Design a protein with these regions (language model features):
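Active-site neighborhood of HAD-like aspartate-dependent phosphohydrolases
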Residues: 1-28
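Helix-loop "lid/cap" segments that line or gate small-molecule binding pockets
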Residues: 15-16, 36-49, 105, 136-137
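Metal-dependent phosphoesterase signature
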Residues: 42-79
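Short, acidic loop-to-helix structural element flanking the phosphoryl-transfer center
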Residues: 66-93, 99-103, 130
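Substrate-recognition "cap/lid" segment bordering the active-site pocket of phosphatases
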Residues: 70, 98-150, 154-163, 177
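Nucleotide-sugar donor-binding loop of glycosyltransferases
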Residues: 171
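Conserved small/polar residues in nucleotide/adenosyl-binding loops
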Residues: 178-185
Length: 185
C-alpha cells in the first residue's frame, strides 16, 4: 500500500549507528520488511542482546517517524481500493507492523474507510505463520477459496502459501520480480 522502504531502511541503519553496532546494507534492511519486530532484530542486529531489543525498537521507531512525512501510497493503490469497495469486495490488512504503527500510517494516508478488517504482528503470530489470515477469514466469515493474499515481499507470499490461499505478488514494493518469482504459488 505504502512506499515505506526508504523510511524503514533509514530507521534500521540509524538505529544500528546509534547503538554502535555494525551497519546493514540497504538490501538487508529491505529483506526484513513484512516481518514482526522480534524476527527483524536478529537479522539486522545479530549481536544485540535480547535485553536491548526494546531500546533498539524505540530508537528505530524514532528514526522511522522522522521519515513519516515522506510516506506515500504507491501509484494506483487508492484507485484500486475505490474499485474494490465499489464492487463490494471486502479488503483487509495483514501486517508485520504494530497496531499503533499501522493506525498511524493508514490514518495519515486517509484510507481506513476502504478496509473491512486488519490484523497486526502484536495481535497474531508474525508472517509467515498462517494465524493472521486464518483469523481474518474467521472474523469475516470467509473461506480460503474466497480470498487472495496480495503482497510485495516473500514473507507475504509465504503467508499466503502457509494459509493455503491464492497469492498475488506485486513488484513495485520492497523486492524485485526475480526474488518474488522464486516464491510464487
Amino acid at each position: 500500500l505504502v512506499d515505506s522502504v526508504p523510511a524503514i531502511a533509514r530507521g534500521i541503519q540509524l538505529a544500528n549507528e546509534e547503538i554502535g553496532i555494525a551497519p546493514v546494507s540497504y538490501e538487508t534492511a529491505k529483506s526484513i520488511i513484512g516481518l514482526g519486530f522480534k524476527d527483524i532484530i536478529p537479522i539486522v542486529a545479530p549481536d544485540l542482546p535480547e535485553s536491548e531489543y526494546g531500546r533498539y525498537k524505540d530508537i528505530y521507531v524514532r528514526y522511522f517517524l522522522q521519515s513519516d512525512p515522506s510516506l506515500k501510497l504507491f501509484p494506483g493503490v487508492l484507485e484500486l481500493l475505490r474499485e474494490l469497495q465499489d464492487a463490494g469486495i471486502k479488503t483487509a490488512i495483514a501486517t508485520g507492523k504494530s497496531r499503533k504503527g499501522l493506525s498511524r500510517i493508514v490514518n495519515r494516508m486517509n484510507v481506513w474507510d476502504y478496509f473491512d478488517d486488519s490484523i497486526t504482528a502484536d495481535e497474531a503470530l508474525p508472517k509467515p505463520d498462517p494465524l493472521m489470515l486464518n483469523t481474518l477469514l474467521e472474523r469475516n466469515g470467509l473461506t480460503m477459496d474466497e480470498i487472495v493474499m496480495i503482497g510485495d515481499t516473500e514473507h507475504d507470499i509465504k503467508l499466503g502459501k502457509a494459509a493455503g490461499v491464492r497469492t498475488i505478488a506485486v513488484t513495485w514494493g520492497a523486492v524485485s520480480y526475480t526474488h518474488l518469482r522464486a516464491h510464487e504459488t
